[in-house]
Amino acid sequence: MKITHITTYRLPPRWMFLKIETDEGVVGWGEPVIEGRARTVEAAVHEFADYLIGKDPARINDLWQVMYRAGFYRGGPIMMSAIAGIDQALWDIKGKVLNAPVWQLMGGLVRDKIKAYSWVGGDRPADVIDGIEKLRGIGFDTFKLNGCEEMGVIDNSRAVDAAVNTVAQIREAFGSEIEFGLDFHGRVSAPMAKVLIKELEPYRPLFIEEPVLAEQEEYYPRLAAQTHIPIAAGERMFSRFEFKRVLDAGGLAILQPDLSHAGGITECYKIAGMAEAYDVALAPHCPLGPIALAACLHIDFVSRNAVFQEQSMGIHYNKGAELLDFVKNKEDFSMDGGFFKPLTKPGLGVDIDEARVIELSKSAPDWRNPLWRHADGSVAEW
């Protein structure tokens, strides 16, 4: 079997799919994207095509190494996201050829189900109580929300109180009947992160995500030393080599590699194993589409340290398409009591509605994340 063609489709709301075709008619799908940089990743995918056309898709490890090492300059969000989507599609092909789901090819299940959590609120958290109430009605009991709006390097008590009050209202409304994580999105400086973590401790959030930017990773162990709240990060780390540094340094309780950013299934399975060796939990990042989610689920079901799975149903970014709008076998992604079950169809287990993909790709938006500014006019972290 040989790879014959690679096609990319930019899609609403902010996704990109790719299709790898073979000379035997077997097709694999992947989801390579950096949110807000889809065109750039698309260009990288087609550059990698030169290494892939005419090659055997079954040699996933070798093709991964070629894409990663054949270029003197490597790594980073664009290259690793392109590799990620290609890698997903190669695993999809292998599973279809062998008539087995990807988790079966990776040694089989370590669990029967995995808890999912749902987003509530928006970029600036609002209507959180109502959002939680609605989602509880369809089985969710675990949630994530943005922990604050933009925050200055040294900000005032009002900004701190606004963040804390949202969390206090959640606990007052629901007590211990639900759990929630707080995503600070790297919006907070290290000095303000120390203040916020101290103030939030009594409300026992499930985790605090990206309290500082990934490039300030030296603060993770310092912040962890002052709190009992688990600290999570990883969506802006792109290979096992970046995760190696934070695991060695300590501080993170939960790793959140993104299966569409960090080299795909091949790389993230290695990252999951590294995390387990350090007694660190795994919770793959996935505010993206169905192929990315499927890839995450296969990793979850073969990784003992996986604890819960993000998914984008109803997330505030989903304008123009919802999580399963491009999927024919929607029933396979249904949740029972807030849990996903293993996908059982061969490959990734996603039956893509290709006609709908082609149609909506003709008018795909060029999504960009908001540009925020502080009151003084300086650029704020989004």
From Swiss-Prot:
One GO-annotated biological process of the protein: amino acid catabolic process
Substrates-to-products reaction catalysed: D-galactonate = 2-dehydro-3-deoxy-D-galactonate + H2O
Originating species: Salmonella gallinarum (strain 287/91 / NCTC 13346)
Site note Transition state stabilizer, residues: E310
E.C. numbers: 4.2.1.6
SUPFAM superfamilies, per database record: Enolase C-terminal domain-like (SSF51604), Enolase N-terminal domain-like (SSF54826)
Gene3D superfamilies found in the cross-reference section: Enolase-like C-terminal domain, Enolase-like, N-terminal domain
CDD domains, sorted: D-galactonate_dehydratase
Annotated site location: Increases basicity of active site His: D258
Pfam families reported for this sequence: MR_MLE_C, MR_MLE_N
Molecular function GO terms recorded: galactonate dehydratase activity; magnesium ion binding
Catalytic residues as annotated in Swiss-Prot or TrEMBL: H185, H285
Binding residues annotated for Mg(2+), in chain numbering: D183, E209, E235
Cofactor(s) essential for the protein: Mg(2+)
Listed name of the protein: D-galactonate dehydratase
Cofactor binding description: Binds 1 Mg(2+) ion per subunit.
Xref: InterPro entries: DgoD-like, Enolase-like_C_sf, Enolase-like_N, Enolase_C-like, Galactonate_deHydtase, Mandel_Rmase/mucon_lact_enz_CS, Mandelate_racemase_C, Mandelate_racemase_N_dom
